Amino acid sequence: MWFRNLLVYRLTQDLQLDADSLEKALGEKPARPCASQELTTYGFTAPFGKGPDAPLVHVSQDFFLISARKEERILPGSVVRDALKEKVDEIEAQQMRKVYKKERDQLKDEIVQTLLPRAFIRRSSTFAAIAPSLGLILVDSASAKKAEDLLSTLREALGSLPVRPLSVKVAPTATLTDWVKTQEAAGDFHVLDECELRDTHEDGGVVRCKRQDLTSEEIQLHLTAGKLVTQLSLAWSDKLSFVLDDKLAVKRLRFEDLLQEQAEKDGGEDALGQLDASFTLMMLTFAEFLPALFEALGGEEIPQGV
């Protein structure tokens, strides 16, 4: 269980939460299949294991792992449009009259309801870790929309969830640009070989560099011309590598082999033990990594009144 992406949310109040109360709350919003006329469903499912008795909360030390599943029927717009056009053409030809918007919308709704039971179903899961001792919720996603879907459903289950996206005092683009300009990152962070540069003008250009020497004259000329670094690949403390963007999304997380080997050793032969060991080691690593990252980016911004 290693997160591949990371969106960080700050709890703005102490969250009085234990495994039993969280398990009970999530049980009120379980994942379930789409009914024949439903476009989508969303709810919580067991992060590890299957079956009705699998717990919805996995606990390790004082960290909680949860998982939400979205199920949606895929009904391509082109299929609906073609069916609607065929129906409208048929009515206009047979009844010698024009079909106007109100009737067209009604026909579209009828077509959707007819096609829905035969539509393909797509399922996707999103994991999140709740760390009350750190005051953080960590979502394994690079999509803010997916993270907000999980958090809003968690808020409904708990009744309230005082949380906001984490922010820092200095604009991330300014810090990332400075690191590439000076060819040195702060603390135990190291600049790797990938970045995205954007012009500050609205219609300005974008340069994406992969497997390139970011200390090269070519890159420095782009920075001198006014481009800002909006994504940068970094390594931290010989433990993990990642890409950080200007929205503080951590993408393409990769934990170094030493950590993964340690998790395999700690987990033993049992599959659940392996998952638990990797989750625990990941969270203990995040407990060191995230404060170091916030500090390197100029410190966490705490909005007034929070």
UniProtKB/Swiss-Prot annotation:
Organism of provenance: Pseudomonas aeruginosa (strain LESB58)
Q: Where in the cell is it found?
A: Cytoplasm, Nucleoid
Gene Ontology cellular component list: bacterial nucleoid; cytoplasm
Signal peptide segment:
none
Keyword line: Cytoplasm, DNA recombination
Q: Which NCBIfam families match?
A: PRK00321.1-2, PRK00321.1-3, PRK00321.1-5
| Family, as annotated | Belongs to the RdgC family.
User: Its biological function?
Assistant: May be involved in recombination.
Checking InterPro entries in the record gives: RdgC
- Please tell me where this protein is predominantly located: cytoplasm
Q: Which GO terms describe its biological process?
A: DNA recombination; regulation of DNA recombination
Q: Name one Pfam family in it.
A: RdgC
Q: Gene encoding it?
A: rdgC
Specify the protein name. Answer: Recombination-associated protein RdgC
Entry GO MF terms: double-stranded DNA binding
